[in-house]
C-alpha cells in the first residue's frame, strides 16, 4: 500500500496524496541555449516525461529558463545552488518548481525572500539531499555519509522552511549506493508526510544505471514509498523516462505503452525469436496502449503465455500460432511473425476507436 503523503502540484502535475507516481528527467543541455533545451524537453515530453528539471548555474541560464518555461509542454523545475538571486529570477519567470536547499543559500533573510516569492506563486520547493554533498558537521558527527546523516540533513532544511510557514515541500535523499538510499528513504518516510522524490543518483550508464535504479526504486515503490521519480543515467535523458515507466509498469503502478512478454529462448526454440522480439519491440515503441503482446519460442510455455496476452505468437519449427484473447487466429510462417503481430495489434486498436 502506498504511503499517505500530502499532495502538492508542480505546474499541472499533482505529486503525492492519491496521485500516481510521476516520471521526471533532467536536461543535459546548456540551459543558456534555449533552443537546444526546448528541443530536448519536447523529446522528453514525447517519451512521456511529466516534469523536467534544468540546471541554473548563472543569471544567463535563469533568464533563458523563463523563455524555456513559456514554451515547454510540461512543467519545468529550476535546479538552484547557493545563489538566492537565481531562485528569485526563475520565480519571476514563472517556473513551476524549485530544487533548492535553504540551508545552502546563506543568511536567513535570503531564504525568507525566496520563500515569500515562492509562496506568492504557489511554487513548491524540493529539498534535495545528496550523499556526496552533506554538511561538514554531519560528516564529522557520523564519520561518513550514512542514511541517518542524510535524513538529519533533510530534516534540518525542512525545519527552515517550516519555521517560515512554508509547507509546499517535497524531499529527495539520493546516493549512488542502493542499500544506503533505500535505508534513508525508509527512515525519512517514518518521520514526515511530505511527498518524496525518489532516485539513485549517479547510477551509471544505460546498463548498470538501469539495474541500480530498478533495484533501488523497485524496493521503495514496493514498500509504498515514492511520489515522483527520476532514473539518473549517463546518456540520453529520454532513456531515463523509458526506464522509469518500465519500473512502474513492472509493479503495476502505471500503464504506459504496450507490455511485451518474450521468452529468453532455450534449446527447444526453433525460430529466430530474438530477432522477432526485437523487431516487434521496436515497432510497438511509439504505441501508447494498454495491451500485452507475447512472443514465445516453443510449445512448453508458449501457448499458455500467448493465450494470456491480448495478442501472442507461440513458435514451432519455422512457424508459429498467432493467438488473440486466448483463441488461435491462424498459423504464421516465421518470416511473417512480426508483421502478423503488428497487424493484429493495429486491428485491436482500430476496433477500440
Curated annotation (Swiss-Prot):
Tagged with keyword Lipid metabolism: no
Keyword tags: 4Fe-4S, Iron, Iron-sulfur, Isoprene biosynthesis, Metal-binding, Oxidoreductase
GO annotation, biological process: isopentenyl diphosphate biosynthetic process, methylerythritol 4-phosphate pathway; terpenoid biosynthetic process
Cofactor note: Binds 1 [4Fe-4S] cluster.
GO MF term set: 4 iron, 4 sulfur cluster binding; 4-hydroxy-3-methylbut-2-en-1-yl diphosphate synthase activity (ferredoxin); 4-hydroxy-3-methylbut-2-enyl-diphosphate synthase activity (flavodoxin); iron ion binding
Keyword Metal-binding included in the entry's annotation: yes
Family statement: Belongs to the IspG family.
NCBIfam families xref list: ispG_gcpE (TIGR00612), PRK00366.1 (NF001540)
Protein name per its UniProtKB record: 4-hydroxy-3-methylbut-2-en-1-yl diphosphate synthase (flavodoxin)
